[in-house]
A protein has these predicted regions:
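PAPS-dependent sulfotransferases, especially Golgi type II membrane carbohydrate sulfotransferases
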Residues: 1-46, 165-243
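The Walker A (P-loop) glycine that initiates the GxxxxGKT/S ATP-binding motif of P-loop NTPases
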Residues: 50-51
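Structural element of the ATP-grasp superfamily
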Residues: 64, 131, 208-209
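Walker A (P-loop) phosphate-binding loop of P-loop NTPases
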Residues: 54
């Protein structure tokens, strides 16, 4: 087994601190704003869209934005429960995305190789646990339901919050607009991103090294059973009443 570099160890420590404090709005959102990490809730925000990384965040953001006939302001991509909590407490509509924990965790470590699988698992828990008490005040969507179910998802948001967001016109043109918005978001980001971990480069898929993915999956399955059960329980709690 290779010995992690000093940079890897520092990156892991930074990730631990970041995820351990990510549910404190005043602290986490101030840090996100300073580092240009995502878009933080403000009084003019129309909706918050958040989720653990690799859970359809970019697609949900772009699908909603592309469908609108008028400009809207979306808080998104901080990957911090603080953004969700701040949105709920401000009375702003909130959409939380969730992906099955094993797939989400493996997706993250494939693009953030300094992280260990167990660290990424703790990050999943630290994202969803603090917002579980707010479950009945938000709309939740599985990541796999975002693309094909965007119209139904926006209708759920409108029904839950009394909003009037436009639903998408599912045409080749609207898909092109959505894809352009995703590309623009990834291209126009500013700031250093996460401490030491930096910015994630957009990848069209997670089809990377099959050996790396297989090792990551094996590490997930050999992680403490109590942690795996907790992540599965969180996923169940957020999705059990979804259509």
């Amino acid at each position: 087994m290779s010995v992690p570099s000093a940079r890897s160890l520092a990156s892991r420590a930074a990730y631990e601190v970041m995820t351990m404090t990510s549910h404190f709005p005043r602290l986490a959102l101030r840090a996100a704003r300073a580092r240009g990490h995502g878009v933080v809730v403000t009084p003019t925000t129309d909706i918050v869209i958040e989720g653990y990384p690799r859970s359809g965040n970019s697609l949900a953001f772009a699908s909603l934005l592309a469908a609108q006939s008028a400009s809207i302001t979306i808080a998104h991509h901080t990957h911090a429960p603080a953004n969700v909590i701040a949105g709920v407490e401000a009375g702003i509509p909130v959409l939380v995305l969730i992906r099955a924990p094993e797939d989400a965790v493996i997706g993250l470590v494939l693009i953030k190789p300094d992280l260990t699988v167990v660290q990424a698992m703790r990050g999943y828990r630290r994202f969803y646990e603090p917002i579980l008490p707010y479950r009945d005040r938000i709309v939740v969507s599985r990541s796999e339901d975002v693309d094909d179910g965007s119209e139904a998802l926006i209708e759920r948001i409108n029904q839950r919050f009394g909003t009037s967001f436009d639903t998408p016109d599912v045409t080749a043109n609207s898909r092109s607009t959505r894809d352009e918005l995703i590309e623009r978001y990834w291209r126009d980001r500013v700031g250093p991103g996460l401490p030491l971990l930096g910015r994630t480069e957009r990848r069209p898929s997670e089809e990377l090294d099959d050996d790396v993915a297989s090792r990551a999956r094996a590490e997930y399955l050999s992680a403490p059973a109590s942690l795996r059960r907790r992540l599965s329980g969180l996923y169940q709690s957020f999705t059990e009443d979804l259509p």
